[in-house]
Amino acid sequence: MCRVDDKPASIRLNLALSDIAPVEDYNHRISIFIKMNNPTENGLSSNEEYPILCDIEDEVINRLETLEDIFAGTVKSQGRLELYVFTKNPEKSEELCKEALKKFPDYQWNCSIAEDVKWDIYFNFLYPDIYSYKAMMNRSVIENLMKQGDNLEKEREIDHWLYFYSEESLNLATKKLKELGYNILSSKKMENEADDSY
């Protein structure tokens, strides 16, 4: 869960694209906005409407993939489902979007095409910041542990590393962490560090 324009949002994306994007010749982005008919009070999809929104997404993406378009991600927020796809055939892709969405006459939608050579929408909007990314990876670890029957309530030792630019900051943090019940195993000045980290 995150926020878009200070409103609750759910973003799902293809993280693997970060290693290869921008993909050569895929210079145009298709943005498809579908208005939800029954969103929750916070603008996300309701349990009742979720299955049909999945059907809409599947229909659109499956058609666009026949052109080898690249699905980048979705956003659910403010009563809308947004789909983002990169294409090298913008006109054909737009036609396929329209065909796919005709199957859902009860839904209002809008489709637009824009040049996005650097994949800005992917890297600057869909892709998570460092903290969100770490939360996603932590969630993935927890899910894997649960699948393997791990007892998540079992206490276990966890190591943390902190870096400081001054000895004063180090000492203040050490004092506070000890007050919170943490054990400090070591603290020392880093050797061969140009920035004098502690």
Regions found by a protein language model. Name each.
Residues M1-Y198:
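Long, contiguous binding/interaction regions
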